[in-house]
Amino acid sequence: MQKYEIILYWSDEDRVFVAEVPELPGCMAHGATQEATLKSVNEAIRLWIHTAEEFGDPVPEPKGRRLMLA
């Protein structure tokens, strides 16, 4: 798995954890727990990359995995 930065935070409005991947526009996931959200966002990263490659779009190189809790 590529090592992309993940920003994980709690959304009071939606009452779920949200994970965003800034290096992959639009790549995000949510879940009831931090663990479930991280599992979902890793799948979202895999699917984002697969879709980009399928359409011939560039896939950004990861800057290094870092988990930020906000």
Task: Identify what each model region corresponds to.
Residues 23-26, 61-63:
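Hydrophobic residues in alpha-helical membrane-spanning segments
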Residues 1-5, 35, 39-70:
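Short, charged, surface-exposed hinge/linker loops at domain edges
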